[in-house]
């Protein structure tokens, strides 16, 4: 896009386009100075410098020693690798989620950690009219969801506390956990038993069970869950549902390169 075209855009859009223009130019060279970069992207040196300093602060750009040359860091690679991992994960999970849906007829979710929340990255809707409302991309708290608990339970306690440090606990129901101190022993239990539960903690009338999915390094990268209206949930079948989830999660984890699924 020419610089004249950029100037016709609203300021916020123009700034974003300029940032991506700089990133693209940086990606074409191992390192590049401000003068050459400003000529390539057709912006003033002061504008390029301002954007570079912001990207440097955010960790996307590095300045080479005492020189005035700049280069991209691996942070963009990390973002791209994470996106590709999610694509592979969803592709691997889809078959197993559809089988779980066939066996249970209930809503099946795949959720991943995003900062201090879970985000649903894939789902299969229940075959019943009465079912949990959700959508791909929806965010929910870690502390009140079954998936959230399994995403935290296999992490170091210091990391868990760091993730939850800025979380504002909100009581959605009478059963909602409202502090990190109360959550930590629950996470110990989740790790020991191999699954997490949401017993009307996020929404009244809703019960969820979740198990972990591991990547090739043995790190929990997602939670796989079944969600039921409480009127359709049978406590006597809890372990049967857990076994179904473990079977599916074991196969997904194997597809992701992890063959020592612990349950």
UniProtKB/Swiss-Prot annotation:
Keywords: Cytoplasm, DNA-binding, Repressor, Transcription, Transcription regulation. It comes from the Bacteria. GO terms for molecular function: DNA binding; DNA-binding transcription factor activity. GO terms for biological process: negative regulation of DNA-templated transcription. It comes from Escherichia coli (strain K12). Residues 34-53 bind DNA. The gene is kdgR. GO terms for cellular component: cytosol. It is found in: Cytoplasm. It holds the Pfam family HTH_IclR. Residues 89-258 form the IclR-ED domain. Residues 13-74 form the HTH iclR-type domain. This is HTH-type transcriptional regulator KdgR. PROSITE patterns: HTH_ICLR (PS51077), ICLR_ED (PS51078). InterPro entries: ArsR-like_HTH, GAF-like_dom_sf, HTH_MetabolicPath_Reg, Tscrpt_reg_IclR_C, Tscrpt_reg_IclR_N, WH-like_DNA-bd_sf, WH_DNA-bd_sf. CDD domains: HTH_ARSR. SMART domains: HTH_ICLR. Transcriptional repressor that negatively regulates the expression of kdgT, kdgK and kdgA, which encode proteins involved in transport and catabolism of 2-keto-3-deoxygluconate (KDG). Also represses expression of eda, which encodes the Entner-Doudoroff aldolase, by binding to its P2 promoter region.
């Amino acid at each position: 896009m020419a610089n004249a075209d950029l100037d016709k855009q609203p300021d916020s859009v123009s700034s974003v386009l300029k940032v991506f223009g700089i990133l693209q130019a940086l990606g074409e060279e191992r390192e590049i100075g401000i003068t050459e970069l400003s000529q390539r992207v057709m912006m003033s040196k002061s504008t390029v410098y301002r954007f570079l300093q912001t990207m440097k602060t955010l960790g996307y750009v590095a300045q080479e020693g005492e020189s005035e040359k700049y280069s991209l860091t691996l942070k963009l690679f990390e973002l791209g690798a994470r996106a590709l991992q999610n694509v592979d994960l969803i592709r691997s999970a889809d078959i197993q989620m559809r089988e779980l849906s066939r066996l249970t007829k209930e809503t099946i979710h795949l959720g991943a950690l995003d900062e201090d929340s879970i985000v649903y990255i894939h789902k299969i809707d229940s075959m019943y009219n009465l079912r949990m409302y959700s959508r791909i991309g929806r965010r929910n708290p870690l502390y009140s969801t079954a998936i959230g608990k399994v995403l935290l339970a296999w992490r170091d306690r210091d990391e868990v506390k760091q993730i939850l440090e800025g979380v504002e606990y909100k009581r959605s129901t009478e059963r909602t956990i409202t502090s990190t101190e109360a959550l930590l022993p629950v996470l110990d239990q989740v790790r020991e038993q191999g699954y997490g539960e949401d017993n009307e903690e996020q929404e009244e009338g809703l019960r969820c069970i979740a198990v972990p999915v591991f990547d090739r390094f043995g790190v929990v990268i997602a939670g796989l869950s079944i969600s039921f209206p409480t009127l359709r949930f049978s406590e006597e079948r809890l372990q049967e549902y857990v076994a179904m989830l473990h079977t599916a999660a074991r196969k997904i984890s194997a597809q992701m390169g992890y063959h020592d699924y612990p349950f």
